[in-house]
Amino acid sequence: MRFIFVNELIKFASKNKNAYLVTSDLGYRAFEKFAKIFPQRFLNVGVSENNMIGVAAGMAMTGKKVFVYSILPFVLFRSLEQIRNNILHNNLDIKIIGAGGGFSYNVQGISHNTSEDISITRSLPNLSVYNPGSRFEAKLVVNLMLKNKTPCFVRLGKAPDRDFYNKNLRCKNNEGLILTKGKELT
């Protein structure tokens, strides 16, 4: 899903000179292509997630379209206060991408696992939460998120990268994804 996500982000950045990607020393393999095409718009702040959020907030206040990326527990749990105070209370158009939801990185231990992220993010003000489950949904989410001018949080799984749905499905922000129309509830 990360590579689908990045390809959509590259398409967007090609048309939008204010699009920036900020990472905290992660995502090199996934974002190598973005960094090569847009070296001046790819920022690595080092292992400093709180500063990453602060930098992103400052950039957004100057009109930049900022995407921040890290492993999910790092970008969310370590930076929650900065996300809440700097991004959400100012309703800044920043997209927070957390990779490896759930137990995707279980080999690295408890510091890399997340099972609480959806409940935490859903309780925060001014935040749209996306949780794609396939490559198709990841592509759909990027396009929905780009139309959304408010803060967004995207939970990307590490694997599997397979599609479950028909590619002709359509979805709008804050609406469910209708798989099949029917008259009975199961």
Regions found by a protein language model. Name each.
Residues M1-L156, P160-D161, R170-E175, K181:
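Thiamine diphosphate
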Residues T186:
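Glycine-rich phosphate/diphosphate-binding loop of Rossmann-like nucleotide-binding domains
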